[in-house]
């Protein structure tokens, strides 16, 4: 072991066997990540829980009694945080987690293993919530190819589809929160969202790794499709 620049003991993984360099570096990063260790102590399923916690601490998005949708929810770190914040376990709020993958049970969270792109998904979601959602959030990341431009377009495309889903299930005044990666490719997405939301901004919580281009798009004050329709009508005149 050695100490890093903060004075903490740093774990190194010896090379050997068939472990690839990329796997070795990933394992070292996990072993030396304080958020990973804290997540284990706090009972969270992933370090991502602290990203949502830090964003919520700053912007106060999650309140008791709210209805929340967590897209691409597995393994469930964000759902755990949301359930605690809105009081889902005791019935005050509701959290519906959606993913193609299976997810272990989270107290107070309703899980649906489905594709949110399915045309029937918005209606099914409303039935599970008993109405619209106050917040739609997504920590999803698209599968990468290693080709930077292609990956950026895939990521933005995924967020665009999540935003379209959100526009079908959010209540007026609702919030959309989604992971993006810093690039010029999301400029058009920002423009689109500004038509439907009172405020749109990028935020980067401390729990996001410093060497990562990861950040989050936060859109608040959902106005529905009325603002977009009015703008389109004005442009057509």
From Swiss-Prot:
Its EC number is 2.1.1.166. SUPFAM superfamilies: S-adenosyl-L-methionine-dependent methyltransferases. Keywords: Cytoplasm, Methyltransferase, rRNA processing, S-adenosyl-L-methionine, Transferase. The active site is at residue 179. It is found in: Cytoplasm. Transmembrane segments: none annotated. GO terms for cellular component: cytoplasm. It comes from the Bacteria. GO terms for molecular function: rRNA (uridine-2'-O-)-methyltransferase activity. Its main location: cytoplasm. Gene3D superfamilies: Vaccinia Virus protein VP39. It catalyses: uridine(2552) in 23S rRNA + S-adenosyl-L-methionine = 2'-O-methyluridine(2552) in 23S rRNA + S-adenosyl-L-homocysteine + H(+). Specifically methylates the uridine in position 2552 of 23S rRNA at the 2'-O position of the ribose in the fully assembled 50S ribosomal subunit. Belongs to the class I-like SAM-binding methyltransferase superfamily. RNA methyltransferase RlmE family. PANTHER family: RIBOSOMAL RNA METHYLTRANSFERASE (PTHR10920), RRNA METHYLTRANSFERASE 2, MITOCHONDRIAL (PTHR10920:SF18). This is Ribosomal RNA large subunit methyltransferase E. It comes from Rhodopseudomonas palustris (strain TIE-1).
């Amino acid at each position: 072991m050695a100490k890093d620049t903060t004075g903490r003991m740093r774990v190194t993984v010896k090379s050997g066997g068939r472990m690839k360099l990329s796997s070795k570096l990933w394992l070292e990063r996990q072993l030396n990540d304080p958020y990973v260790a804290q997540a284990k102590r706090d009972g969270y399923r992933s370090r991502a829980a602290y990203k949502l916690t830090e964003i919520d601490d700053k912007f106060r998005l999650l309140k008791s009694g709210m209805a929340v949708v967590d897209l691409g929810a597995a393994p469930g770190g964000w759902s755990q945080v949301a359930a605690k914040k809105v009081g889902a376990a005791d019935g005050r709020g509701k959290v519906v987690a959606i993913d193609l993958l299976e997810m272990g049970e989270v107290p107070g969270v309703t899980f649906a293993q489905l594709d949110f792109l399915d045309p029937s998904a918005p209606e099914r979601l409303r039935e599970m919530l008993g109405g619209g959602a106050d917040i739609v959030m997504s920590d999803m990341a698209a599968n990468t190819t290693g080709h930077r431009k292609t990956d950026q377009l895939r990521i933005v495309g995924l967020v665009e589809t999540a935003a379209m889903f959100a526009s079908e299930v959010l209540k007026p005044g609702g919030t959309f929160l989604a992971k993006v990666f810093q690039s010029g490719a999301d400029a058009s997405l920002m423009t689109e969202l500004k038509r439907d939301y009172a405020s749109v901004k990028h935020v980067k919580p401390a729990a996001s790794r410093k060497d990562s281009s990861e950040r989050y798009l936060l859109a608040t004050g959902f106005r529905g499709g009325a603002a977009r329709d009015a703008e389109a009508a004005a442009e057509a005149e």
